[in-house]
Amino acid sequence: MKANELKDKSVEQLNADLLDLLKAQFGLRMQNATGQLGKPSELKRVRRDIARIKTVLTEKGAK
């Protein structure tokens, strides 16, 4: 997910994407805790995508 792609989305769509990613992050954290996580890099990718969305939401709120 690129920041440029996110800037084209509406605030409602960004909030929906953020909610989906937070749910995915929770599931990945549970898999990691139980030792079932196959790709640890997936947790890192989701965390960074969440940060990107929050950054774009903050930028849109400041305008």
Curated annotation (Swiss-Prot):
Protein name (database record): Large ribosomal subunit protein uL29
One example of a Gene Ontology biological process annotation: translation
Taxonomic placement: Bacteria, Pseudomonadati, Pseudomonadota, Betaproteobacteria, Neisseriales
UniProt organism field: Neisseria meningitidis serogroup B (strain ATCC BAA-335 / MC58)
CDD domains noted in UniProt: Ribosomal_L29_HIP
One Pfam family recorded for the sequence: Ribosomal_L29
GO molecular function, one term: structural constituent of ribosome
Coiled-coil segments: none
Gene: rpmC
GO CC term, one of those recorded: cytosolic large ribosomal subunit
InterPro entries given in the database record: Ribosomal_protein_uL29, Ribosomal_uL29, Ribosomal_uL29_CS, Ribosomal_uL29_sf
